[in-house]
């Protein structure tokens, strides 16, 4: 059976922490959007209603994931990764065919009435693939050729396909996930450090290839004096601390 409804196998502390964070998020979203929602739509629950729909969908996915036997995911790890690579290629090819080579970033795949961001699927597939690989190769993971190199090459393929969308931040996040999971899997520290070193040699020029990537970093360090939209979130964080301090001004204020 692939579905297990026994509550004894759940990670209860993690479950309670997740539920707590969900409720905190609901309160924060409602508190921060109630005025804007009322001023723009004449009722105060527009944004929180959309947020609750997403929470409900996410909760259903979480419950399904809790009941799913993780051993079944082992069988899907390889095919799921290949499928995600196919989706990344399909997203880029279809977007180029429709909009040309100088088009905007090709990050979304339209499927009928909804769209999916294929890099998110790729990120999940990489996590499942690496978890399965580390479990199978735990005795050889410290060997570079037989243990460390194969997952590195697979993750590099995914990262390159995401970079050319272009979506540099997601690609960098996947690279970070790879390093963390291999570190937990007890890969050699030298292999991890060398991967970081050569990765930076490759990624830093790629980052400078697009001006907006560099601008995001410079606006972060000089954000309060940068009046462009790139620093909006950073400026608002300063304003919130200035108005409410550490304790804030209260819900809905």
Segment roles from a protein language model:
Residues 60, 78-85, 145-161, 168-208:
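Hydrophobic alpha-helical segments of polytopic membrane proteins
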Residues 99-108, 191-253:
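Hydrophobic, glycine- and aromatic-enriched re-entrant/interface helices and adjoining loop segments
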Residues 29, 62, 173, 189-190, ...:
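Short, electropositive, low-hydrophobicity segments enriched in small/polar residues
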Residues 162-165, 169, 223-227:
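Conserved phosphate/pyrophosphate-binding and hydrolysis machinery centered on Walker-type P-loop NTPases
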Residues 1-16, 21, 27-165:
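Membrane-helix boundary/helix-loop-helix interface segments in multi-pass membrane proteins
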Residues 28, 135, 184, 222-225, ...:
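Signal for well-folded cores of large energy- and translation-related assemblies
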Residues 71-74, 128, 132, 170, ...:
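Short helix-terminus and kink motifs of transmembrane alpha helices
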